[in-house]
Amino acid sequence: MRQVAIYGKGGIGKSTTTQNLTAGLAERGNKIMVVGCDPKADSTRLLLGGLAQKSVLDTLREEGEDVELDSILKEGFGGIRCVESGGPEPGVGCAGRGIITSINMLEQLGAYTDDLDYVFYDVLGDVVCGGFAMPIREGKAQEIYIVASGEMMALYAANNISKGIQKYAKSGGVRLGGIICNSRKVANEYELLDAFAKELGSQLIHFVPRSPMVTKAEINKKTVIDFDPKSEQADEYRELARKIDENELFVIPKPMTQERLEEILVQYGLNDL
C-alpha cells in the first residue's frame, strides 16, 4: 500500500488534481482510498458526483464516539473510497487536530484494508503546523507530491512544505516524489517549475495544462476522466497517474533560502512582481 500526501497552497487546485489523478489511477486498476484533510471538505466531491459528504468530525459531533465505518466512508468513481476529515467549528479548536482524530478513527474502524494499492491524503499546505503535518509526522504518508504553479506564493508555499518534509524525513521514512504543476499560464512556467524542482533535488513529475474542460467537469460534479474520457485533458491526468504509478525518484528535499528562491523567480522573468 502506497500512502501518498498531496500538499500545496490553498486554491492551487490540490483537490481537483488529487481527484482527477486518482480517477486515472483507478482506471489503471488500482484500489484507492482518498482522505480529505482540508477543513473545506471538498476533496471528494467530484468522485462522489457532488454528494456533500458528511465529515468525520461532523459525524463525531452528532453521533458521539459510536460511529460505523459506512457512515463516514462512501464509494465513488472507479470504486474509490472517499472520506472527509472535516474541520472544527469556526473559531473553535484546531483543524490539524481533526486530521489526527480522523486518521485514528479510520484505523480503528478498519478502513485501511490489505487490498488497497493507494491511500491519498489531500492536505491544506499553506500552514505546515503540527496538525497539517500529521500525515508526514506520524509516518502515515511515505511519499509527498506538491501541487504548485508559476506564481510566487505557490512556490513560496512549496518551499515551506519542503522544509516540513525535510524535518520529518530524518525521523520517519517520508520522501518528496515530485512537483505537479497545475498551470496558471504564467510566462516561462514550465521552465521555472522545472528549475525549482531540480533545485529541491526533485523532479517536475508532470505539467498539467490549464483547460476549461476542468471547470466544465467540476460544474457537472465529475472528474474530467468521468465527464469526458476522450478529451485531451483526461489524457493529461492519465499521464500524471502513469508517472506516479511508475515513479521511483523519492528524495529528501533541499529547501532553498528566500534569496535563492527569489533569484530563480527573477531568472525566469517573475521579477516584475
Swiss-Prot record:
One of its GO terms (biological process) is nitrogen fixation. CDD domains: NifH (cd02040). The keyword 4Fe-4S applies. Its EC number is 1.18.6.1. It catalyses: N2 + 8 reduced [2Fe-2S]-[ferredoxin] + 16 ATP + 16 H2O = H2 + 8 oxidized [2Fe-2S]-[ferredoxin] + 2 NH4(+) + 16 ADP + 16 phosphate + 6 H(+). One of its GO terms (molecular function) is ATP binding. Binds 1 [4Fe-4S] cluster per dimer. The keyword Chaperone does not apply. Its cofactor is [4Fe-4S] cluster. Keywords: 4Fe-4S, ADP-ribosylation, ATP-binding, Iron, Iron-sulfur, Metal-binding, Nitrogen fixation, Nucleotide-binding, Oxidoreductase. Disulfide bonds: none annotated. Pfam families: Fer4_NifH (PF00142). ATP binds at residues 8-15. The reversible ADP-ribosylation of Arg-97 inactivates the nitrogenase reductase and regulates nitrogenase activity. The modification ADP-ribosylarginine is found at residue 97. [4Fe-4S] cluster binds at residues 94, 129. It is an enzyme of class 1 (oxidoreductase). It comes from the Bacteria. SUPFAM superfamilies: P-loop containing nucleoside triphosphate hydrolases. Belongs to the NifH/BchL/ChlL family. The key enzymatic reactions in nitrogen fixation are catalyzed by the nitrogenase complex, which has 2 components: the iron protein and the molybdenum-iron protein. Homodimer. This is Nitrogenase iron protein 4. It comes from Clostridium pasteurianum.
